[in-house]
């Protein structure tokens, strides 16, 4: 789908949402415009697919403009226009290119409640009921785990370069497994070896009491 911008250059913010909502190279055109007034900053999106055009508008106060709020308004207007042309409501709403729990976990860590996190996903990102419950439940568990960490603990991130399928909100999946399932087992074996080696490097009884000592609880290396 062709994407044209007027009045702004936030292409990535709009394009990643377009890739999520219209992933199959849909024939059509989308125009994302930003109009600056003295009081309001107005985002307008018009999308034409198969001869049918839909439009939507979102605005923020010009005095409140930040990069985040501007991009949010652009994405909201795009989503609300696209929703009118889609056969089903996207379960993850206007989310694109992010982990849904990243938003809700950050909200909870900053003092928000599960209820306000749910409202954030509903009112800002238009996420459906069941997906909101899933995201908030995951974030509550994440925050609980974070609060259990001690000074001698360590949180390790393991990157996975492929996914079983492409999530509906994702605009940058590295690679779906597809016909490459034969690579899964050797990759997991290599990953297990790397985790074991990393564990041995972190688990040093002779070191002082840091994350490199026997007090480190998240690894158990044989």
Predicted regions and their residues:
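Short Lys/Arg-enriched alpha/beta "domain-start" segment
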Residues: 1-31
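N-terminal [4Fe-4S]-dependent radical SAM core
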Residues: 86-92, 109-156
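Short secondary-structure boundary motifs at beta->alpha junctions and helix caps
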Residues: 53-75, 85
């Amino acid at each position: 789908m062709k994407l044209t911008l007027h009045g702004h250059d936030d292409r990535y913010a709009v394009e990643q949402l377009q890739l999520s909502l219209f992933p199959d190279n849909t024939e059509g055109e989308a125009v994302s415009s930003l109009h600056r007034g003295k009081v309001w900053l107005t985002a307008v999106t018009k999308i034409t697919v198969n001869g049918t055009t839909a439009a939507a508008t979102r605005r923020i106060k010009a005095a409140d403009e930040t990069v985040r709020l501007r991009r949010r308004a652009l994405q909201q207007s795009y989503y609300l226009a696209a929703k009118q042309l889609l056969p089903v409501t996207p379960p993850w709403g206007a989310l694109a290119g992010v982990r849904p729990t990243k938003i809700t976990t950050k909200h909870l860590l900053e003092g928000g409640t599960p209820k306000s996190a749910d409202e954030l996903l509903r009112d800002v990102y238009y996420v459906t009921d069941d997906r909101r419950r899933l995201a908030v439940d995951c974030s509550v568990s994440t925050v609980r785990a974070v609060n259990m960490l001690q000074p001698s603990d360590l949180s390790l991130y393991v990157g996975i370069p492929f996914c079983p399928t492409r999530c509906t909100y994702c605009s940058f999946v590295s690679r779906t497994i597809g016909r490459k399932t034969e690579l899964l087992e050797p990759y997991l074996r290599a990953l297990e070896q790397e985790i074991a080696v990393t564990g041995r490097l972190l688990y040093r009884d002779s070191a002082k009491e840091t994350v490199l000592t026997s007090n480190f609880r998240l690894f158990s290396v044989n």
